């Protein structure tokens, strides 16, 4: 909350053993002068292979929370590794994935975004990945529920990026 840009490093590896300590993500805190220090106690233990990390204030409390999209389970392509939803509580990130259990093993996430797709003034979660369809999770007071959108049926594939924009210029 000091305004300095910190650095989150997601870990991944196909050849690493399951639960390897090398799969633990890292958070480096910027001291304001361009020097980063590795934090040792701000992230929960997460020893899985990830790919996409996004930040957004999904719970509306004024700080940035995180979603970490899991990718491949080491040594077991195309099985997905776990994804995580981390709530920022006074600078410490707590694993609250179990509040939205469908997020945990949704697929091999390539990219995710927080966006208010339904214009209800909270951040929803959209994601794409390998061997999956574009997926939307509606934010209902901090709990993410998967929804089905008309037009996204039968769209499974190898998706690698997603962008949110008002393409028709109508304000939504």
Regions found by a protein language model. Give the residues of each.
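Beta-propeller blade termini
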Residues: 1, 42, 50-60, 64, ...
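Short, solvent-exposed loop/turn segments at conserved positions within beta-propeller repeat blades
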Residues: 17-23, 75-81, 130-132
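Hydrophobic beta-strand positions in blades of beta-propellers and related beta-sheet-rich domains
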Residues: 7, 25-27, 66, 83-85, ...
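Hydrophobic beta-strand segments that make up the repeating blades of beta-propeller
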Residues: 7-11, 66-70, 124-129, 172
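Repeat-solenoid scaffold signature
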Residues: 128, 132, 141, 153-172
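Blade-edge motifs of beta-propeller repeat domains
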Residues: 28-48, 86-107, 138-157
């Amino acid at each position: 909350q000091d305004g300095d840009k910190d650095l989150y490093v997601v870990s991944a590896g196909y050849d690493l053993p399951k639960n390897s300590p090398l799969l633990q993500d890292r958070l480096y805190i910027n001291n304001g002068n361009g020097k980063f220090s590795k934090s040792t106690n701000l992230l929960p233990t997460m020893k899985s292979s990830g790919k996409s990390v996004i930040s957004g204030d999904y719970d509306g409390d004024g700080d940035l929370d995180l979603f970490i999209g899991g990718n491949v389970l080491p040594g077991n392509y195309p099985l997905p590794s776990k994804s995580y939803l981390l709530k920022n509580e006074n600078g410490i990130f707590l694993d609250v994935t179990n509040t939205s259990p469908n997020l945990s093993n949704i697929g091999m996430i390539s990219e995710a975004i927080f966006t208010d797709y339904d214009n209800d003034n909270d951040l929803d979660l959209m994601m794409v990945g390998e061997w999956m369809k574009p997926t939307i999770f509606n934010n209902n007071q901090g709990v993410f529920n998967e929804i089905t959108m008309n037009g996204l049926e039968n769209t499974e594939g190898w998706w690698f990026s997603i962008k949110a924009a008002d393409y028709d210029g109508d304000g939504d």
